[in-house]
Amino acid sequence: MTQYDVVIAGGAMAGATLALALSHLTDNQLKVAVVEPYQVDTSHPGFDSRSIALSYGTVDILRRFQLWPSIAPCATPITDIHVSDRSHLAMTDISAQQVGVDALGYVVELADVGRIYQSLLQRCESISLYTPAAVDRVERFTDSVSVHLNNGETLQAKLLVAADGAVSNCCQQLGMNLAQHDFEQIAVIANVVTEQAHRGRAFERFTEHGPVALLPMSDNRMSLVWCLPPDLAEQVMLLSDEQFLERLQQEFGWRLGQMQKVGMRASYPLILRHREQNISHRFAVVGNAAQTLHPIAGQGFNLGIRDVASLAEEITKQLDDVGAYSSLMRFKQRRCGDRQNTIWMTTSLVHLFSNDYLALRVARNLGLVMMDNLSGLKQPLLRQTLGLVSR
């Protein structure tokens, strides 16, 4: 049985960020184990690489943990965000220049960040990486937790952290209740190329079927997230590339000129999942294991990184017992407001912008017009978009 201070189940962005943050904040004083079922694929997926958007606040967190310098060279800045409603004049724009920042956020490819984090984890003397391996069974005692892996090894620690995704095996084993709401939408994702260069612009276009988002990537690609009812999503997935681009053109419009190329498509159901409790005895939950949101406002991953930052800070306040109940309660209290507010905001946006009822159509267009002309109404949206929220 190998002894650690913290065992983290899940070595993707949330889990790896937590491990590296603990290393930085404690100057390698804590022994940390990261258990990850999947080894990083060293081959790059090329044109079809999947990506995520990091908010300004998330980048600030990564800077403080000394992680951003490694990620920055492969990040594409978002300098403008354009929000509009199809077939109506209402729109609002947010620009980095107006806000007084270099970028509103950045888009990074998961393949790039995965390789960077893998290298950082392997070079860190206080972190042990178990991969491919998964948590098979968890036993909790008064002062410790035993984590049994599917490769036969057993790890003992003061704290187990679940960062193992939306359908968290650790949370299921420990009976952490999961609340779910099916949005009855499917996200169709792909990378596309448009006639006009994106120039760092991100777009969110609301339609009667659901939102269409385009995020700027390297090599003038754009990352598409197209939210549709299940029947329409099935139709769209069966279209030829040419037909797909024509349908997308109809929904998005000509703001970027002609849609010229689309890569491999994928789809997944959009379901709100959130744990009612994010702590238990010797146990904490972060990232998608704590909550998985609709992508309408790009908040899910950034909310998870705020989980990670708050937990890392609380752990390092009590190094003699990193899994102490007092530390976990402080973490829970810090995260409560942000979690509730972000979940409420995201869900409200889905219901407001994903249908064509006349009353809601008028309301959302009026809202976009008012936000574009009244800075007082725009500020709350701006702060949430930038990730500048209390945690």
Where are these regions (language model features)?
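Conserved N-terminal helical subregion
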Residues: 74-173, 181-186
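Conserved FAD-binding catalytic core of PHBH/FMO-like flavoproteins
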Residues: 62, 160-258, 262-265
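C-terminal helical "tail/cap" subdomain of flavin- and related membrane-associated enzymes
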Residues: 313-391
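Glycine-rich FAD pyrophosphate-binding loop
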Residues: 23-48
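N-terminal FAD cofactor-binding segment of flavoenzymes
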Residues: 46-86
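FAD/FMN-dependent oxidoreductases across multiple families
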Residues: 234, 238-325
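N-terminal Rossmann-fold NAD(P) dinucleotide-binding loop
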Residues: 15
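Beta1/beta-strand and adjacent pyrophosphate-binding region of the FAD-binding site
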Residues: 1-12, 33
